[in-house]
Amino acid sequence: MSLTENLQLLLNLDSLPSKRENLIKRKECGLTIMLCGASGTGKTTFFNTLFATSLQPEKSYETAKETIAKKTLEVKKNKAVIEEDGFHINLTVLDTPGFGDFIDNTSCWNTVAEYLDEQHERYLIHDQNSLRVPRKDTRVHVCLYFITPVSFGMLPLDVLAMKELSTHVNLVPVIAKADTFTTPELTQIKQKIRRILEAQSIDVFHPSTEYSDYETAELLDSSLPYAIISSVNEVCKDDGEKSQGRRYPWGTSEIYEETHCDFLKLKKLLINRHMLELINTTETNIYERYRREQLTNRKSGIPKLKKEHYERLNNEKRAIQQKITQMTNETESFFQAKEEKMIETRDALNSELSEYHERIRALETQIESLKSYKGRGHKK
């Protein structure tokens, strides 16, 4: 499937956001979701499960090997159009293959943060240039960060990455593969992660009661981070009914069973209840903060430098520094050679002068001897 191919998907959206009329009034509604986290956390499977389609191809061993061999992090884009009863949502999903896959993952989140800022920058430039041309909104409305759970909560990489990304996008933490933990273990891990998020002042998205009833908003908020199970396969339960989930020798994990995972809660947050809030908070909070900072810190009309500009300027700076260093070394070598030659000349002159002094002293001695000899001969 082409990454830019638009797919017409007819999905059963149980309930559109409670402020559906506000969405319908728009000529079109765009929702951009970013999937971030280390490989193997189930990002692709989750998205295909959420929208009941193979919007993103499952990664094979060869694909993963190629990504690691590249040793680069990139942002890949897939597009689709969700439609129901004449209501259209232009959906864009962004994947981040290569995130956290290398031995040295220092600042691996910078590529993602720069991409997020670049979308805000494009929107800002359009605001400054013209209001007549329709704006193409490529801003990311929500980032689902797939946490790699460990006994003490989460890895330092996840903590640092989430802390950085939370200032650029609506961040929703997700614990993937929840069926690998027992219920008590999952409860403890959730508590530890919530404590870490609070201690590190990581700003995650909290659903508001303005966009859904109090009970729903409170339930969604208290369930953070969302523990999910993803599967595109149907399994047969003990009673003979079919359900989407995973089958194990000891039982079945169902993705739509709220006692098993938070998949339905996350779906309510993204699609059913708080989609409009994600879009609006991106506009009113995140973008406005970016816009205010940029207009305050730089001259009007001057676009923000992109990564490649910084790289070019840094390369030029390094070239100038190398040239200066080379010229300095050449000058020092020139004067050092001159100094050595002058010292050699000085030593030669001093040696010659010493020889003259020795000859003078020898002549003076001879003169004194002649005077003494002549004096003795005169007395006789």
Curated annotation (Swiss-Prot):
GO annotation (BP), single: cytoskeleton-dependent cytokinesis
Compartments, record wording: Cytoplasm; Forespore membrane
UniProt KW keywords: Coiled coil, Cytoplasm, GTP-binding, Meiosis, Membrane, Nucleotide-binding, Sporulation
Region G4 motif: start-end pairs: 176-179
Stretches the record annotates as G1 motif: 37-44
Record domain Septin-type G: where: 27-297
Region listing for G3 motif, in residue ranges: 95-98
GO terms for cellular component: cell division site; cytosol; mating projection septin ring; meiotic septin complex; membrane; microtubule cytoskeleton; prospore septin ring; septin complex
Pfam family, one: Septin
Membrane topology listed for this record: Peripheral membrane protein
Gene3D superfamilies named in the record: P-loop containing nucleotide triphosphate hydrolases (3.40.50.300)
Location, primary (coarse class): cytoplasm
Family matches, as PROSITE patterns: G_SEPTIN
GO MF annotations, alphabetized: GTP binding; GTPase activity; molecular adaptor activity
Binding site for GTP: 37-44, 72, 98, 177-185, 246
SUPFAM superfamilies membership: P-loop containing nucleoside triphosphate hydrolases
Coiled coil: 304-380
CDD domains: CDC_Septin
Keyword Coiled coil (UniProt): yes
Function: Septin-like protein involved in the correct orientation of forespore membrane extension during sporulation.
Quaternary structure annotation from Swiss-Prot or TrEMBL: Component of the sporulation-specific septin complex composed of at least spn2, spn5, spn6 and spn7.
Protein name from the UniProt record: Septin homolog spn6
Organism for this UniProt entry: Schizosaccharomyces pombe (strain 972 / ATCC 24843)
Gene from which the chain derives: spn6
